[in-house]
């Protein structure tokens, strides 16, 4: 493979938007309609952080068709992202564990067929890893189509060289950049537009359906068994890294403050250990509900009906941000600048809805509570 062209973030030499003085050659052959493939496979938080790039593309390229390749576990979330046409699920994590199994070979062939069913004018690798480079390389491009990727690593993010080897054009980004802005800037460089305005995620939850859990002993309003009689705040304590956790005693103190202030507490979990923690917290509270195990789709839809979310740096907390919920994100490390809620523009004259709290070894319950009280007043569950 030849070394790709490397550009700084800015107008790319590849596919261009059909307006604003840009080169329309690549899109003219398609009647002004561009087909874009986003490659962002995992993890949960990273997938959420890529969603605003889709909304930018829709705003800048009317009529654009956007497909997205993602790990199957996160596909239910991407299907709720406005503007995504086809979600192409893969299971690279599982396939790598059993590469020669008959089931793996069958599923791999089916995945390749789905991936190559359409030709794309732009294949954009937003992941920057070998596995995403492989997917981008396998994707089919149109006659004038090109593959794009990051030319360099950004602070705190994984990056592997094959992503730039596979790309027709690798785009250099500033190393100190928020995860949301990184994806937005890369897509903007591909099509020659500027990133403006706050990030819009376009995450639209589904309606509460019959499979969404009902709290025992609560009939709710209007026949909807989930709807709370008072505002409910979800606490997200689970995380894949032990050093991101918050002490159990701190969760209990926070939950007691919420109960005393008139909030009900909901506790999410994804593993047996997290469920045990949820039950331990709930046992110390007057009004708490440990949610049953749910798929990502039901969990997203259920969380959307809460008055707010307080959680550690985890995928569920990032979903809360994308849903636009009042949210406090807890950090034991000074990395909120990279993955936490983006700061509100002081000139926008808007009430603050989402903040992060950082301290070492961890923020105190008082600091988190003060952050919660500083937010715009939570509304009752819908």
Can you annotate each of these PLM segments?
Residues 1-382:
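Catalytic machinery of carbohydrate-active enzymes
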């Amino acid at each position: 493979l030849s070394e790709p062209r490397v550009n700084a973030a800015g107008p790319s030499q590849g596919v261009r938007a059909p307006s604003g003085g840009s080169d329309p050659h690549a899109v003219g052959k398609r009647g002004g309609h561009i087909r874009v493939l986003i490659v962002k496979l995992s993890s949960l938080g990273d997938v959420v952080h890529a969603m605003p790039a889709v909304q930018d593309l829709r705003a800048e390229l009317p009529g654009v068709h956007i497909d997205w390749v993602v790990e199957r576990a996160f596909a239910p979330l991407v299907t709720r992202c406005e503007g995504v046409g086809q979600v192409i699920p893969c299971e690279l994590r599982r396939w790598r564990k059993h590469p020669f199994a008959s089931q793996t070979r069958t599923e791999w062939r089916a995945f390749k067929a789905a991936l190559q069913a359409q030709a794309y004018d732009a294949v954009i690798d937003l992941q920057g890893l070998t596995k995403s480079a492989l997917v981008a390389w396998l994707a089919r491009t149109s006659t004038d189509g090109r593959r794009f990727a990051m030319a360099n690593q950004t602070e705190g993010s994984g990056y592997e060289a094959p992503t730039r080897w596979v790309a027709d054009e690798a785009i250099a980004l500033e190393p100190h950049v928020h995860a949301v802005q990184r994806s937005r800037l890369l897509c903007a460089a591909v099509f020659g537009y500027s990133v403006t305005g706050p990030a819009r995620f376009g995450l639209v939850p589904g309606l509460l359906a019959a499979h969404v859990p009902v709290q025992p002993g609560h009939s709710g309003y209007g026949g909807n068994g989930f709807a709370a009689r008072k505002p409910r705040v979800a606490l997200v304590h689970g995380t894949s890294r032990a050093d991101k956790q918050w002490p159990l005693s701190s969760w209990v103190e926070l939950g007691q403050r919420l109960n005393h202030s008139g909030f009900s507490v909901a506790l999410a979990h994804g593993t047996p250990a997290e469920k045990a923690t949820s039950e331990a917290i709930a046992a110390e509270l007057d009004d708490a509900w440990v949610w049953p195990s749910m798929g990502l789709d039901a969990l997203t839809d259920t969380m959307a009906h809460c008055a707010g979310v307080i959680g550690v740096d985890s995928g569920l907390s990032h979903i809360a941000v994308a849903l636009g919920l009042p949210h406090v994100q807890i950090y034991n490390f000074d990395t909120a600048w990279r993955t936490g809620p983006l700061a509100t523009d002081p000139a926008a004259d808007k009430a603050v809805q989402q903040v992060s709290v950082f301290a070492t070894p961890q923020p105190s319950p008082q600091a988190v509570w003060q952050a919660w009280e500083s937010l715009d007043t939570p509304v009752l569950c819908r």
